[in-house]
Amino acid sequence: MSWQTYVDEHLMCDMDGHVLTSAAILGHDGSVWAQSAGFPELKPAEITAILNDFNEPGSLAPTGMYINGAKYMVIQGEPGVVIRGKKGSGGVTIKKSNMALIFGLYDEPMTPGQCNLVVERLGDYLIEQGY
């Protein structure tokens, strides 16, 4: 299965009638493995800050997290495993696997819980597969 198939069929899937706004799978070096249409381009400093928060949980909380210059308030995730952010009526969930970062961005009517479920389910699967 290609990385694009994981994005198209497992991240951009219908969740109770709602779909993520955009999604992507990136390597820890920031390289894009696959992404949906409309996924924002991440700047190198933004990827570095996200990876730093996985290594030092809480480091993003004081300043917020930035995705393509848009600021997200960091909300409780799972230290070292999941980062969650909120911006207006939407937000982001980022799951870290051994080799990848799985991003899901959403807006209402999708809920944070639905986004978390979609992103974390794929992340857990990739971890089980050694990725």
Curated annotation (Swiss-Prot):
<comment type="subunit">
    <text>Exists as monomer and tetramer. Occurs in many kinds of cells as a complex with monomeric actin in a 1:1 ratio.</text>
</comment>
<dbReference type="InterPro" id="IPR048278">
    <property type="entry name" value="PFN"/>
</dbReference>
<comment type="similarity">
    <text>Belongs to the profilin family.</text>
</comment>
<dbReference type="GO" id="GO:0051289">
    <property type="term" value="P:protein homotetramerization"/>
</dbReference>
<dbReference type="InterPro" id="IPR027310">
    <property type="entry name" value="Profilin_CS"/>
</dbReference>
<keyword id="KW-0206">Cytoskeleton</keyword>
<comment type="function">
    <text>Binds to actin and affects the structure of the cytoskeleton. At high concentrations, profilin prevents the polymerization of actin, whereas it enhances it at low concentrations. By binding to PIP2, it inhibits the formation of IP3 and DG.</text>
</comment>
<dbReference type="GO" id="GO:0005856">
    <property type="term" value="C:cytoskeleton"/>
</dbReference>
<keyword id="KW-0963">Cytoplasm</keyword>
<dbReference type="GO" id="GO:0003785">
    <property type="term" value="F:actin monomer binding"/>
</dbReference>
<keyword id="KW-0020">Allergen</keyword>
<feature type="disulfide bond">
    <location>
        <begin position="13"/>
        <end position="115"/>
    </location>
</feature>
<dbReference type="GO" id="GO:0005938">
    <property type="term" value="C:cell cortex"/>
</dbReference>
<dbReference type="InterPro" id="IPR005455">
    <property type="entry name" value="PFN_euk"/>
</dbReference>
<protein>
    <recommendedName>
        <fullName>Profilin</fullName>
    </recommendedName>
</protein>
<dbReference type="InterPro" id="IPR036140">
    <property type="entry name" value="PFN_sf"/>
</dbReference>
<dbReference type="Pfam" id="PF00235">
    <property type="entry name" value="Profilin"/>
</dbReference>
<keyword id="KW-0009">Actin-binding</keyword>
<keyword id="KW-1015">Disulfide bond</keyword>
